[in-house]
Amino acid sequence: MKNQKTVVVGMSGGVDSSVSALLMKEQGYNVIGLFMKNWEEKDENGVCSSAQDYDDVRRVCDHINIPYYAVNFVENYRKQVFTQFIADFQKGWTPNPDILCNREIKFKVFLEKALELGADFLATGHYCQNLILDKGSPSLVKGIDHNKDQTYFLYTLNQQILQQVLFPVGGLEKSQVRDIARKHQLVTAEKKDSTGICFIGERDFRSFLSQYVAIQPGAFQTLQGKNVGKHMGTAYYTLGQRKGLGIGGAGEAWFVVGKDHERGIVFVEQGANHPALYCDELIATDLSWVAEAPLLPYTCQSKVRYRQNDQFCTIHRIENGKAFVTFDRPQRAVTPGQSIVFYVGNICLGGGVIQQPGPTYYDQKKSLPHQSPRND
């Protein structure tokens, strides 16, 4: 076909990217499958399934009759994602490597590789939409299946990138994607979705982290200064955490409500809705906008963690690359290192990395509004 466009599909060995490749071929594109390896199996002690994943890619590509290749970005990933991930933990943050991977690997060096192969577009199996709306430029829009929507992880995509990428399953429900895979007898039709962080696999997170972040025991302490147990290091705990604290006694469950990384203290209190877990403002840095930054002050919706219900907020000002944000309702466990992502309805505007939550309701001696919702 003389004017046939070429699409490189980023294939992970899962059902979403498999169906993405199929749909691109059905739509008349010249399709190339490209598998990306980001982590060395020798580091995984045999746990990582990358060999099986690539075998599934090969079988799918053979089945739908498209060529496929593998690329090795292990060194890129280690330098640009994993090193930052560990550095953030070492300073007491709780980072999100998926966001960094999308920015530095999938939609940077992987996209560059696709273009090298002669692609007009890169397609991935993400649940989001790339739509031309009223302004005539691409918009990053939530996937039809809001339960699977992945725009939270993709807020760093900009106009230039959006002009080069396609999201074939973004307009489908997950159940429809599996139905298509079954109908076309793809080997990945019933394959379980991957969860967690790729370089950790099924292993215990703490045991993995301990290989890279020193165990520095300290005290679990209440906000009144009472020691109630010992922890293995502030890096191993995150705000709002309940499981794995090992604090006994009567009464309600214990939760992490704060950390003093310099002094090696993890602050804990009892009760899922303790006021020390809530704040209604934050400062975000490392800002990224899909189009242009909004005129301020700007009221919109946001998420401070994946799958959170959208929360109304106002971006008041941006100074020295930092956004000062307040919320209409108290937010639970706003965590440094995670991202706040901004929306207008289903349109993703951009976001930034949470640097500092505001003072808690406990700090301000404020009561939580009646029936404050668990919004996580």
UniProtKB/Swiss-Prot annotation:
Record-annotated site: Interaction with tRNA: H126, Q338
Localization (cell): Cytoplasm
Region ranges (Interaction with target base in tRNA): 96-98
Disulfide bond residue pairs: C101-C198
A single Gene Ontology CC term: cytoplasm
Superkingdom of origin: Bacteria
Pfam hit, one: tRNA_Me_trans_C
Gene3D superfamilies for the chain: Adenine nucleotide alpha hydrolases-like domains, HUPs, Translation factors
Region of interest: Interaction with tRNA: 148-150, 305-306
Catalytic activity annotation: S-sulfanyl-L-cysteinyl-[protein] + uridine(34) in tRNA + AH2 + ATP = 2-thiouridine(34) in tRNA + L-cysteinyl-[protein] + A + AMP + diphosphate + H(+)
EC number(s) per entry: 2.8.1.13
GO biological process terms on file: tRNA wobble position uridine thiolation
InterPro entries (alphabetical): MnmA-like (IPR004506), MnmA-like_C (IPR046885), MnmA-like_central (IPR046884), MnmA-like_central_sf (IPR023382), Rossmann-like_a/b/a_fold (IPR014729)
HAMAP family on file: tRNA_thiouridyl_MnmA
Protein family membership: Belongs to the MnmA/TRMU family.
Function: Catalyzes the 2-thiolation of uridine at the wobble position (U34) of tRNA, leading to the formation of s(2)U34.
Protein name: tRNA-specific 2-thiouridylase MnmA
